[in-house]
């Protein structure tokens, strides 16, 4: 890999610069030897791109990619830079990686997690939304949803929705989906968005290989939400069709999980005989972003190339322009302007 270039000393300097966010040092090293962008450490096979993505150094990420770094390179765990950025919530980096057409559907070697799993487990809803940008047409949610549920014969749309469904419902080891993870950790925004993206509310973990022995195999996202204890997550799952009567392989209801985990405030909602009124939940506001159009325009016109100079003003996170022409308040609570 990288050490085959015979520049291990310079390569390690670039790794340090990428990790520490030293843009000047990174640019100097790459000006001298652009091949260093493909350098990787021996032990962990982590590239400078992995380090920069994990730390959120977006300008260095762009610099490395423009100098030939492989946007889909993996470390020893099989994780890509996109997974690292989603894991730590660096949505600006996710945006940059998408501009360079990273593969969002790849899964790591250790647990089979995709970028969606890494975003969902830590509640990074902006990263989650960006990761599905190429699957969602740039149209209002109501239009997209009507087209999906109606009698439209649009083959392209059906293909896009099929690809989106497969991606959103992709299971990691043990059958755990991104929805399971978001529900367990109580990230309502992620749960809401995943459900709007047609995540399967009734999907169950595998009967083998599950790492959540406390919850049990064959568990639904509602079982996981009951363990996590977030009332709002449980409410929206029930509102979207999750069954309070679903039994896992241990014969436990979501109510049983809630009791075992000490989540007694969930009992009135999860009781099979509950007569509580479930609130209505509107579609996620994050779906209103026309990200597919924005990304395609940026890719076509190469808007990223002007964003890697640290001495210039940063681009707007919404419209990808220097002088923003969009009103931030029109997109609340979506991706905000950087300050």
Question: Would you name each region that the model predicts?
Answer:
Residues 25, 59-60, 92-93, 126-127, ...:
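Conserved ankyrin/ankyrin-like repeat signature
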